[in-house]
């Protein structure tokens, strides 16, 4: 096959320096698909750290880079062993097809070349809301492991916090959500969003933090019921510490929820396409 294409891509050259560049894409193989991107989302959490230069270093990190881990588009060309056909709409969780420019995460481009195993077909009726599959899969992953419980308290009512709450409601829970910004306390269905200062309960068995605030751990431990669990599901740009005595007295468990897995993506695709999980009202 060995066809090559070019694309316009958003490139972060360095912190706080962004350009639109023409980039040569990797050659297309028999197991790849070429996707013309229709919509791509911007993460105001993780990708803001990339923009500001505050993203902690991890493998694959570096500049220049193409951001974007939540894109939707139509297949322009499909490799003979890809299992897809031109014209199919797919979700693309990023791409690494830009040569020396790092694909972290690689979806903010007019066209991408990506292994077919990385994409997933989406129902065209979802439209641009399908870019939320990555965040929805992240939300699903928080409580997908064996023995995990749906949250009683969620910290933060951004898009990820709302999706975690919606999934909890589907599972029969009615979580409380703490949100310090009064403008973000709207839009709750089946759960309550409050100012943390107004919370009278203060003892929760399962707490999920998606605020990204590395200084909150002691506060969360003070609100934990004995034997309870705190799940860190945000991304933190500073070290996290806590006072040991109160964690000891509560026999606290602290867990990190990392990146979603393919089974999480499939689960939220089924929930969204069946209409059980609403993705409405989340894109700003």
Regions inferred by a protein language model and the residue ranges of each:
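NAD(P)H dinucleotide-binding glycine-rich loop of Rossmann-like/cofactor-binding domains
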Residues: 90-155, 165
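C-terminal substrate-binding/catalytic core of Rossmann-like NAD(P)-dependent dehydrogenases/reductases
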Residues: 236-284
């Amino acid at each position: 096959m060995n066809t090559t294409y070019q694309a316009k891509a958003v490139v972060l050259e360095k912190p706080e320096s962004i350009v639109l560049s023409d980039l040569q894409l990797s050659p297309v193989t028999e197991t790849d698909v070429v996707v013309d991107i229709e919509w791509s989302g911007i993460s105001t959490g993780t990708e803001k750290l990339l923009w500001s230069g505050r993203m902690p270093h991890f493998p694959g990190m570096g500049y220049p880079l193409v951001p974007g881990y939540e894109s939707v588009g139509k297949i322009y060309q499909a490799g003979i062993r890809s299992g897809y056909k031109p014209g199919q709409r797919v979700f693309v969780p990023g791409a690494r097809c830009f040569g020396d420019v790092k694909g972290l995460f690689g979806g903010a481009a007019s066209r991408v070349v990506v292994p077919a195993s990385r994409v997933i077909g989406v129902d065209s009726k979802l439209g641009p809301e399908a870019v939320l599959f990555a965040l929805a899969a992240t939300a699903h992953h928080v409580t997908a492991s064996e023995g995990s419980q749906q949250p009683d308290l969620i910290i933060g009512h951004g898009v990820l916090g709302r999706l975690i709450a919606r999934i909890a409601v589907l599972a029969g829970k009615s979580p409380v959500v703490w949100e310090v910004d009064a403008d973000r306390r709207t839009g709750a269905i089946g759960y309550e969003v409050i100012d943390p200062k107004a919370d009278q309960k203060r003892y929760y068995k399962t707490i999920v933090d998606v605020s990204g605030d590395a200084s909150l751990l002691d506060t969360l431990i003070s609100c934990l019921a004995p034997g309870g669990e705190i799940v860190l599901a945000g991304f933190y740009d500073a070290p996290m510490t806590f006072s040991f005595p109160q964690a000891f007295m509560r026999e606290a468990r602290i867990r990190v929820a990392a990146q979603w897995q393919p089974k999480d993506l499939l689960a939220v695709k089924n929930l969204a396409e069946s209409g059980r999980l609403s993705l409405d009202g989340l894109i700003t």
